[in-house]
């Protein structure tokens, strides 16, 4: 297997006295292998994974506290509803009460 792309099945004439320089070397099929480089510099130390220690103990900044106070109604997470149920139910209910009271007043 080690002499895969070097013409192992054919007798080599270059070994019988002729230099191998003028004959080009056949390349193996497929992607060429990666050439290994010698490490020139020492490897950097690995950084620890995950959340750093003590990051949970920090108090929020003043700007974040003001922002939290100004937010009124909190929306649920995820994709918003196509037809918000609260808005659709409240408006027709108020309109129907007003129209029914107007109709009853007109009938009398």
From Swiss-Prot:
Sites bearing Phosphoserine, chain numbering: 44, 100, 104
UniProt key word Repeat: yes
Superkingdom per UniProt: Eukaryota
Keyword Coiled coil (UniProt): no
Organism: Mus musculus
Residue span of region Interaction with E4F1: 44-63
The protein's name: High mobility group protein HMGI-C
Assembly and interaction partners: Interacts with E4F1. Interacts with NEK2.
């Amino acid at each position: 297997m080690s002499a895969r792309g070097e013409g192992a099945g054919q007798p080599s004439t270059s070994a019988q006295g002729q230099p191998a320089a003028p004959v080009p070397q056949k390349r193996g099929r497929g992607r060429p292998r990666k050439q290994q480089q010698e490490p020139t510099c020492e490897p950097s130390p690995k950084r620890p994974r995950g959340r750093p220690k003590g990051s949970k103990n920090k108090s929020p900044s003043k700007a974040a506290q003001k922002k939290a106070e100004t937010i009124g109604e909190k929306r649920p997470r995820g994709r918003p509803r196509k037809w918000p149920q609260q808005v659709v139910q409240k408006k027709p209910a108020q309109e129907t009460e007003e129209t029914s009271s107007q109709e009853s007043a007109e009938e009398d």
